[in-house]
A protein has these predicted regions:
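Positively charged n-region of N-terminal signal peptides that target proteins for export
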Residues: 1-4, 322
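Short amphipathic alpha-helical "recognition" segments used for binding
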Residues: 6-7, 130
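Bacterial N-terminal signal peptides
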Residues: 7-18
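Sequence-structural signature of mature extracellular/luminal beta-sheet repeat domains
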Residues: 21-364
Length: 364
């Protein structure tokens, strides 16, 4: 027992150093490892979390070890000038010469998970503000949900149930609609999810009432909230189901892994789906044709349903996530996260016209 407590304390110290790289805005909601009560909670874990190095990766978009590159390092001037880029045509996906347009900006880690609502507006998870806001097609922002316990990524299933990862102390996957309730917050041994180490990064909700989520590894919380881990040698970040829900995609550093989804939601046949041309994969989305879109560095990589890399859509800055929205769901939105010289995060939402249509069978 004493050895486990010592290991837990060493983990807390290492994790605190990673989180100290980013300054919280005044009044911001802390993520679990930043909370003063985190050390005591971790010391009670039956199975202590592994050290950050064992989970792989640097700070991800959730600000947690184990993700992709995440927010860029503080530049000498802020914001840094945008990179020059030229969009070349990808047949059926995007026309040549299209440009990204900045449509909204805010301070803090306040534009993390994004997805479309039924009217084509963009729902945005605000991690530091513990809120969800709606960005309409006229550029106006209004609150939708408050007090989301440092809520991050969002996912809506085909039946309209909206789920969110909540990253405050005692992390959980929460259903926001139609009924607001905690969906999953414990592992099979009774430990809180915090005992996995770091914070929950992303999620994808299925039509069975279950939710796949990433937290260093890959997990599935079934309709009753029972959590099972899947996959081997994974350094996860983004996760999403194919339109037919027969395949689950999850980023794994410079590659994307795929799994066959079984009738009960369990996963089999882990395999490498595609190797990315640059950067570590972060956010994922799909279109109506079943193509997969992966944000990695200053680009969105487009992958056919058979794993063939079709091309890349360059961007002026590194993107942490992307989603289709708009009235016809033919606009792609991407989120940029930058850190200023005071170590404060800033979030920017960009949009670009697409030839491809986002999948309309669910929000993302």
């Amino acid at each position: 027992m004493k050895r486990n407590v010592l290991l837990s304390l060493l983990f807390v110290l290492a994790n605190a150093l990673a989180f100290a790289q980013i300054v919280l805005p005044p009044g911001a909601s802390p993520q679990s490892p930043q909370d003063p009560g985190y050390q005591g909670l971790i010391a009670s874990c039956k199975t202590p979390p592994p050290p950050p190095a064992a989970r792989g990766g640097g700070p991800g978009r959730a600000g947690a070890p184990g993700g992709a590159a995440g927010a860029a390092a503080a530049p000498a001037t802020f914001p840094p000038p945008p990179a020059d880029y030229t969009v070349t045509a990808i047949p059926g996906v995007i026309a040549a010469g299209q440009k990204w347009t900045k449509v909204w900006e805010t301070s803090g880690n306040n534009a993390d998970g994004i997805l479309a609502d039924k009217d084509g507006n963009l729902l945005i998870a605000q991690n530091h503000n513990s809120a969800v806001v709606k960005l309409d097609q006229n550029g106006s922002v209004s609150p939708v949900y408050r007090d989301t316990h440092t809520g991050g990524a969002l996912s809506m299933n085909k039946k309209g149930a909206l789920f969110m990862v909540q990253r405050g102390l005692r992390e959980n996957v929460t259903e926001l609609a139609p009924t607001r309730r905690i969906h999953a917050d414990k592992l099979a041994n009774g430990d809180p999810l915090d005992c996995l180490g770091g914070v929950i990064n992303d999620l994808s909700a299925d039509s069975r009432g279950g939710v796949y989520f990433t937290m260093g590894g890959l997990f599935y919380a079934d309709a009753k909230g029972n959590v099972t881990r899947y996959g081997e040698s994974l350094t996860t970040n983004g996760v999403i189901l194919s339109p037919d829900e027969k395949t689950l995609y999850v980023t794994n550093g410079r590659t994307v892994a795929a799994f066959d989804v079984q009738p009960d939601g369990s996963l089999k046949n882990q395999r490498q789906f595609v190797e990315l041309p640059s950067g570590g994969g972060d956010g994922l989305t799909v279109d109506a044709a079943g193509r997969l879109y992966v944000t990695a560095g200053p680009a969105v990589h487009v992958v056919a349903s058979d794993g063939k890399l079709l091309g890349s859509i360059p961007a002026p800055y590194g993107l942490i996530t992307a989603a289709f929205a708009g009235r016809d769901k033919k606009t792609m939105y991407g989120v940029v996260s930058l850190i200023d010289p005071t170590r404060l995060q800033h979030a920017y939402v960009y949009s670009i016209p697409m030839a491809a249509e986002g999948y309309k069978g669910r929000a993302k």
